[in-house]
Each structure stands twice: as C-alpha cells, then as structure tokens.
Amino acid sequence: SRRILILGAAGRDFHNFNLVYRDDAAVEVAAFTAAQIPGIAGRRYPPELAGPLYPQGIPIVDEQELAALLQRERVQQVVFAYSDVTHAHVMHLASIALAQGADFLLLGPERTQLQSRLPVIAVSAVRTGCGKSQTARWLSRLLKQQGRQVAVIRHPMPYGDLAQQAVQRFAARADLDAA
C-alpha cells in the first residue's frame, strides 16, 4: 500500500480523508499533521471515524515535525488539505515533502466536494476570521424569508470528542446549548 500523510488544520483534512481515503485499502494514512489550532497535536483521529482500516485511529502530529515524520514513517505522498495560507507557505511545505522523497498533492473538487441533488451555495474565504459564519447566517435568513428550506453543512472540527461529535444537527438554539 502507498503511505501518505495528510497536512491539515483539523477540518478539511478530516473531510478529505473521509471522502477519499477512509475505505481505500491501497492507501495507508500514516498521520495527519496539525497546524493553526492549538492543542490538536498529540491526539488521534478516532477509530470510530477512521473506519475498519484504522482500528487504532490515526495520529495527529505537529506540522513542525514534518521532515522527520516523513522519514520516520516512510511516507510516499503528502496531501495538502487546509487553507488560509499563502502560496509561499504551500510551496515551502511542498519543498519539504519533495526533499524527503515524497510526492506532494492537492486533491481537486471532483474528489472532495459532497454530492447533492439540491442546489448548493458554498461560503468560503481566504482565511479564518473573514466572516464566513456571519455570511452563512445572513444567506440562511434571506433564503428562509423566501420560503426555502435551508441546511448548513460544515466539515468536522476538532473541538471536544470527535467520535461523539461525528454528526451534529443544530435545528434550534437549544441544540447548540446541548452540544
């Protein structure tokens, strides 16, 4: 099997893993890396979410250990799976991967976007703090005023127990309080 490492920030990396690699027996995900969010490194992506190919879960390692991790784990391919960084930062990570003999990959939208039979509006931005949540709330209110049914989907986030939060539905403010 091909050994890969997923560079992430505890969100899109998990999403990409779930959609592309979770059930692929030809691939072994050696680890996720953690960047941007403190307190994530040292944890594991839980086996309940990682699936039967990963009965011990998947380690989450600090991105600063990238070069050593690639050598130690004999990683053949590095998959970049987060945003909010400059082109120069992405290319720096690519250079580290290539210097260690690994391929560097960005997954395209055909493999990572959720399929829907309904119309979809994506709210994205170049970095954290740009107002994605506020924009999504504004759009939701506008669409509801037009009589449409609205649902908001977000990729997994690392706050709390990932296994217990595998699927969360917030239909009312009380649902937020219960979470």
Residue ranges of each PLM-predicted region?
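Glycine-rich adenosine-cofactor-binding loop
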Residues: 2-25
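Conserved beta-strand elements of the Class I
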Residues: 3-5, 122, 151-153
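ATP-dependent carboxylate-amine ligase catalytic core
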Residues: 142-179
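N-terminal beta-loop-helix "entrance" segment that forms/cooperates
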Residues: 37-57, 161-167
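Phosphate-binding P-loop
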Residues: 112-118
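Short internal beta-strands
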Residues: 27-39, 153-154
